[in-house]
Amino acid sequence: MNNDVFPNKFKAALAAKQVQIGCWSALSNPISTEVLGLAGFDWLVLDGEHAPNDISTFIPQLMALKGSASAPVVRVPTNEPVIIKRLLDIGFYNFLIPFVETKEEAEQAVASTRYPPEGIRGVSVSHRANMFGTVADYFAQSNKNITILVQIESQQGVDNVDAIAATEGVDGIFVGPSDLAAALGHLGNASHPDVQKTIQHIFNRASAHGKPSGILAPVEADARRYLEWGATFVAVGSDLGVFRSATQKLADTFKK
């Protein structure tokens, strides 16, 4: 049986520096995720760090995206090999790794997604990702079809951005603007000039190493500015944000 994920089109688009417009999925519900998958985004983040997701909620969301052109990207709760292994086995191919601060941490993230000898991923012969053992070339194809995006969101990460971006197997550098702002002493103010200057610096250093850069930017003016600065994979909003804004607007229309 063929696996319809290989080759990984999202990974190829990033490598080709094609602009990829995404959205954040935080509602942790297969219905809302399915709606996002119909909207036409290039990629969707299913959030395991700040949203109430786990293996049991991720699986129905992946099922809901079956046939969607939107590539599912999972943000793991932490850079931990066992967690990453379990997410690989249920069918994720694109990973967003939070709080990467050193080259060694970036290397660990890459190794966690690769079978030996390239990495340390544990081997199961039957799981959801290989259609329960029916994809004949899964082992041969898996290593080269996994996407690793690492988040820079601390001063140490900024200091080591060149080494992180140069790490083999890292496909892109993603800026976490809120945590970065906090780390730079501007909690709750990612628009501060110091934060914006640092974001642009990260984009530039990623580009210098031939790696695409990305960011979450729910404000349109911010998203367009980051695209002008060279970011190529930008999440332009979230299901939670859209839902919150739309319901408040609807209520205000009739209640005020």
Curated annotation (Swiss-Prot):
Name the chain's protein: 5-keto-4-deoxy-D-glucarate aldolase
In alphabetical order, the GO MF annotations are: 2-dehydro-3-deoxyglucarate aldolase activity; magnesium ion binding
Q: State how the cofactor is bound.
A: Binds 1 Mg(2+) ion per subunit.
- Record the organism: Escherichia coli O157:H7 (strain EC4115 / EHEC)
Q: Summarize where Mg(2+) binds, as residue positions.
A: 153, 179
Keywords annotated in UniProt: Lyase, Magnesium, Metal-binding
Q: Which gene encodes it?
A: garL
* Biological classification of the source: Bacteria, Pseudomonadati, Pseudomonadota, Gammaproteobacteria, Enterobacterales
Sites annotated Increases basicity of active site His: 89
The biological pathway it contributes to is: Carbohydrate acid metabolism; galactarate degradation; D-glycerate from galactarate: step 2/3
